[in-house]
Amino acid sequence: TGWAMFGSVSFIPLFVQSVLGTSATQAGITITPMLLGWVTASIIGMRLILTVGHRKLGVIGTTLFVTGAFLMTLIGPNSSQIMMMVFVTMMGVGMGLSIPSFLVAVQTTVERRNLGTATSLLQFSRSMGGTLGVSVMGAALSIRLASNLSASGLDPKLVTALLDPLPGVEVVVDTGVRLAMANAIHLVFVIAFVSAAFGLVAVFFTPHQELKEKSLESES
């Protein structure tokens, strides 16, 4: 899910600017609900773990995230910004609920003296997954965009200007370029959804030892 999450955060603003034709400010506003949902759900999730159980909470959170990621694959040039904000909010809430459950799942499977190492390894793995995800999605986006521009009779060199514009310089994007960009970013969203779906499958294979059981073992 880290792969899909970091990839989405990186490329959703690009879609809002290049395809919907809005400003950088509006692009930032679009992903704000995702971050707010993430933080809020994390706080709530920590309280729910003891009552619901980390595995159920992980399934619920990851399912929400996967649903949001799937809905993002349905957006296009005619989609509204509000619709995208709803979808990314689902993803943010899903991550907020699932991350605490993953943390507890790891911590309940190791001995107390190894808690620090296990937690650090989890954080490192998530960061590495996010970095790898952004790299793979960025490469896929560049290749697909260059192909789309060539097929439309446009200059493939526009890829650099579109993906890495100069500060303070607004790139004029016509309809053909917007369609090419929409198709390229759609591939990114599909990759994010597929990786999130694999994450959901992996949740069902997490250890099912809850906090209360772990506490009893420690006391004995």
Q: What are the residue ranges of the model-derived segments?
A:
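A membrane-interface helix-boundary motif in multi-pass transporters
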Residues: 143-193
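Intrinsic disorder in cytosolic terminal tails and internal cytosolic loops
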Residues: 169, 173, 206-220
